[in-house]
Amino acid sequence: MKTLQTSPKKDGYRMPGEFEAHKDVYLLWPERPDNWREGAKPAQATFAKVAETIAQFESVTVGVSDRQYTNARHMLADNIQVVEMSNNDSWIRDCGPTFVVNDKGDSRGVDWTFNAWGGLVDGLYFPWDKDDRVAQKVCEIEGRDRYRLDDLVLEGGSTHVDGEGTLLVTEECLLSDGRNPQLSKEQIESILKEYLNVEKIIWLKKGIYLDETNGHVDNIANFVKPGQVVLAWTDDQSDPQYAISKENYDMLINETDAKGRKLQVEKLYLPKPILITEAESQGVDTVDGTLPRLAGDRLAASYVNYYTANGGIVFPLFNDPMDEKAQEILQKLYPDRKIVGVPAREILLGGGNIHCITQQIPAGR
């Protein structure tokens, strides 16, 4: 593995849409007791189910710490590869590499700086040094060269692309004080265009209400395919989420993509607000410097936080009446893919969902 001093744009590489073909997908194994309740045992069972479900469609590799290797190997199916990989927590979408591809089928990793969603300003835990090495380790395992950005803090969940030159982000996240206060919006845009090789960036204002990542785009909007966007939605005008989604909807329906197409926007309805219970809160260790999980706190539940696999969609279930409607909408949006729901409250309790715990490797070399 080489660390390259050029850029994807200069080298003819682009970030593909998640709906394009994958070689495999990576997850990290949860274990920290100050984020996952009951010593992470319920979360581990859920992660194992997500991995097993995705393995119906593509190869799966799970990175685990030395402490958890034997346990994870026991809990995960035999067709899932388990590798030792130290980490601070299990959000590989955000700390893992963003892969870019060229027209010959070659791929490389982009290794952004990771600081736990805000560093010492409003980050969610400290330290995060092991997480910041995950992207390099994945590139090493995969035999892919990488681009390393020491001067830009970015998480994979804060970007979605259509593979044809258009990028979706939120101002709430990318312009937050804890990430890149030294850079202007225009400077951030210039770096993203260079390292994702996109031509147009659509800046939504905010993400899901109370999303602790400062409003990652992958929880509120996604490209189904070029020219078509799915958006998290509620009809409840008394919910703070309504104004956020409405502003994003009004922006998107009046936008064009990099190819000049008007965007088709599909609404994916949210479940009713989900709150942490007293029992769930008491199961999480209290540690200074880590975001507490308090009873009554509203969680950032969204069906948009799904994973697009080869031939399948793996989406979160919340034991809510909207689960069934989400399945119907996703089936309409992806008629050629199998739609599979996985009960995902345990991931939600940790601060994210299925898309947040996955990182795909594009097909090719």
Curated annotation (Swiss-Prot):
MF GO annotations: agmatine deiminase activity; protein-arginine deiminase activity
Stored Pfam families: PAD_porph
InterPro entries assigned: Agmatine_deiminase, Peptidyl-Arg-deiminase_porph
Domain of life: Bacteria
Active site location: C356
GO biological process: putrescine biosynthetic process
Keyword terms: Hydrolase
Coiled-coil features, chain-numbered ranges: none
Reactions catalysed according to its record: agmatine + H2O = N-carbamoylputrescine + NH4(+)
Keyword Oxidoreductase: no
Protein EC: 3.5.3.12
Family: Belongs to the agmatine deiminase family.
Family matches, as PANTHER family: AGMATINE DEIMINASE-RELATED
Record-linked HAMAP family: Agmatine_deimin
NCBIfam families linked: agmatine_aguA (TIGR03380), PRK13551.1 (NF010070)
Protein name per UniProt: Putative agmatine deiminase
Source species taxonomy: Bacteria, Bacillati, Bacillota, Bacilli, Lactobacillales
